[in-house]
UniProtKB/Swiss-Prot annotation:
GO terms for molecular function: 5S rRNA binding; structural constituent of ribosome. The keyword S-adenosyl-L-methionine does not apply. One of its GO terms (biological process) is translation. Coiled coil: none annotated. Residues 1-20, 179-200 are annotated as: Disordered. This is Large ribosomal subunit protein bL25. SUPFAM superfamilies: Ribosomal protein L25-like (SSF50715). Belongs to the bacterial ribosomal protein bL25 family. CTC subfamily. It comes from Azoarcus sp. (strain BH72). The keyword Iron-sulfur does not apply. GO terms for cellular component: cytosolic large ribosomal subunit. This is one of the proteins that binds to the 5S RNA in the ribosome where it forms part of the central protuberance. It comes from the Bacteria.
């Protein structure tokens, strides 16, 4: 389901205009890309704040209604106030249905409590990555990628190459190797008990 929300065209630009908007509970933003001119926009702070709390808002194709004109976009950047729960500025990139997107998608870890590493090995599972860089067409963009921990044994790890990615979705690697997504690690208590057992 596409997330839809409203925005208006922003006329005044610059820091003083942005401050006036924020005092009026509005957020300055911009829509750019797809070979078109950048469009400065204004959004309602309260609506945007609650949208940003949704995980799907960060990894979905979004639809912005700008005074009756629909823009299909993805979220690219959000600037927050240093200590207030206030959005200062937001950037959206237009989506071309025929062009692949490069975006971070959240990872959802399942069956961790049933993993042999936990049930039999007394391990804890460390989530080394919480999101994955992917590349795909907009129509193939998943809201999240599931990481099944059901078969994870004590001392083992799950790597990016072992993830079951949806059709048309590729993982984007930064650097060499096959990054670790999650690993089963011995707890201090279990390690101490094991050491005592060996000593006996």
């Amino acid at each position: 389901m596409t997330i839809e929300f409203n925005a208006t065209k922003r006329e005044g630009q610059g820091s003083s205009a942005s401050r006036r908007l924020r005092r009026a509970a509005q957020v300055p933003g911009i829509i750019y890309g797809a070979g078109k001119d950048a469009q400065p926009i204004t959004l309602d702070h309260n609506e945007l704040y609650h949208l940003l709390k949704k995980e799907a808002f960060h990894a979905s194709v979004l639809s912005i209604n700008v005074e009756g004109a629909k823009e299909t976009v993805v979220l690219r950047d959000t600037q927050w106030h240093a200590y207030k729960q206030q959005v200062l500025h937001i950037d959206f990139q237009r989506v071309d249905a025929s062009q692949k997107l490069h975006l971070k998608v959240p990872l959802h870890f399942v069956n961790g409590d049933n993993a042999p590493a936990v049930k039999l090995g007394g391990n804890i599972i460390a989530h080394v990555m919480t999101e994955l860089d992917v590349q795909c067409l907009p129509s193939s963009l998943p809201e999240f990628i599931e990481v099944d921990l059901a078969a994870l044994e004590a001392g083992q790890s799950i790597h990016v190459s072992q993830l079951k990615l949806p059709a048309g979705v590729e993982a984007v690697h930064h650097g060499e190797g096959d990054p670790v997504v999650a690993s089963a690690q011995t707890t201090r208590g279990a390690a101490a008990a094991e050491g005592e057992g060996e000593a006996a």
